[in-house]
Structures are given as structure tokens and as C-alpha cells.
């Protein structure tokens, strides 16, 4: 597949021209150029600063995804919560990295999407095709995938303007101090452990990023385990886990941010799940909300901790949303 554009005037830079035509940033145009997807007069473009002449034909290729052999463990079933021509909403299982990085050797969610022959947006680097937002490797739950660049741009803008609602469920080893709490701070890499993020209590420092989360208490067990809801206003690396550590609270099963004495004796993954996601459909502008069911392992663990009737009641999506709105 390809798109063709015609330059109507002389001397305009190619990156500026495509940024305007595609409604994306110049950096995103440069990523397309690096991937070898942009041609001018049938010649591959190497630099974004290429000066266009009136009548120049600019071609943008959409790469055809070819299935490739994958490790056996990647040939798994991932629940599709919603799908149309523009996007996917998936229920990501735990122990699956979303996209490749230098430190990532195992197959990723992007590999799985390509294996399943899904059309994906290609504004970012190849290893991030389709990815609008991320979930940590061990976190399960809802993730939105863009099938085309139009969708990617509009969903990214909703994230940037905080119009996309993302709500999580987590199980804490100790109850929150208050029924409703918020953390607003800057996050940066922990100098003592580069795998972790750390909240800065005061001013912004170099290489730190603004972050905000809100937490509500949903249910407390007889042995003081606390089921909570978490709302993201920003989406930084390990944000919920780092913010809870800032409050001296820890998620059951979190081997990175958790306290050793608070971890269960049996092996269990982190009890953190992206439960609700809200956004406006980029094309129809219809408001959409998806409840992403807890996966079996987490649900079974919660049933051991809480009475099923009480658990079902507090997991009602309307009650969770209302609790965040209420003062």
C-alpha cells in the first residue's frame, strides 16, 4: 500500500510538507524516512530537509507485514476486547513485553501483532508499530493498538491532553492511609537501581518527567490486604508502582518495588491490571469505554482473599468511576 502527495509550491522542506499533510510531527516524519518508507520522484529520501519543487511526487509506503517464525511461547491467545478498521483493544497477558528495546530479547506484543497479520500504524520506529501507550511487562489488561496513522495521531493527542481515561486495579500489602489519595511529582531513574523509577519530592530535575496518579480504596481483607483503584493522568514508566512506593505502599507480587516481607510465599506475578479504558473514537468521535476482565490467575487469587459477592460489587465499573469523581 502507498500514499502519493504532490507538492504545489517550490522550496518547502519535505519534512514540513509531510508533517502538515499527515498531521504528525517532523520527528515522526524522520522516523518514516529512517525506515526507508518515503520517496520523492521515485527516489528514496535520505534527509528531511530536502527542498521540494512544484509538481514533485512524494510517495509514502505502508510496509506489508510478513509473518515470521516465532518462539512457541508467542503463539498464544490474546483476548480481543474490541476491533474495527482503525484500532484494537486487547487484554494483554502478564509476562509479555509490549515492544522491543535493547535489553529485550524475548518476543513482544508487536511481534505477536505482526504474526497475526494485523495492519499497524508506522509513525514510530519499526519495533513500536501500532503502539500508542504501553503496559509494563508483568502488568496485564487493556491496551489500545492503532491500525493506521490517522488513528495513532488522534489517540496520541488524547493521551497528551489527558482525554483518554485509564484505570487500574491493584492489590496492596498494606491499606492506603486514606480512602482517596493522589500523587503529583516528577519521576526519574533511581540512582541506586537503574531498573527502578523514583519520585522527586520537590523541584523538577534534569531528565525527570512530570507525573500524576490518583488512588481509591475499594476493599480491605481481614488480614489487611487492600484492593485499590488507580487512575493515570500521565503515563510514565512504572508510574503506579513508583507512586505507591512514594506513599510507602506496595503491590502484592511486585518483586522490584515490593517489600520482601510483604510478598506472598507462593510465586505470583504482580497484582496489577489495566481494568478500564475510555477514549473518543478517532473517526466517529463516539465516546468509548471498555472494561477489560481480570485474567484468571489474578481473579482466582483475589477470590482467595475476598468474599466473591463483595469483590463483584467493588469491581463494578460505574462505582469505580463514581468514586474517582466524588470528592
Curated annotation (Swiss-Prot):
Enzyme class, first EC level, given as a word: isomerase
SMART domains: S4 (SM00363)
Active site residues per record: 136
Domain (S4 RNA-binding) ranges: 12-79
SUPFAM superfamilies: Alpha-L RNA-binding motif, Pseudouridine synthase
Gene3D superfamilies cross-referenced by the UniProt entry: Pseudouridine synthase, RNA-binding S4 domain
EC number(s) reported in the record: 5.4.99.-
Record flagged with keyword RNA-binding: yes
Keyword Phosphoprotein: no
Domain of life assignment: Bacteria
Catalysed reaction, written as an equation: a uridine in RNA = a pseudouridine in RNA
Keyword line: Isomerase, RNA-binding
GO biological process: enzyme-directed rRNA pseudouridine synthesis
Pfam families xref list: PseudoU_synth_2 (PF00849), S4 (PF01479)
Molecular function terms from GO: pseudouridine synthase activity; RNA binding; rRNA pseudouridine synthase activity
NCBIfam families: rluA_subfam
Family statement: Belongs to the pseudouridine synthase RluA family.
Protein name: Uncharacterized RNA pseudouridine synthase HP_0745
Species this protein is from: Helicobacter pylori (strain ATCC 700392 / 26695) (Campylobacter pylori)
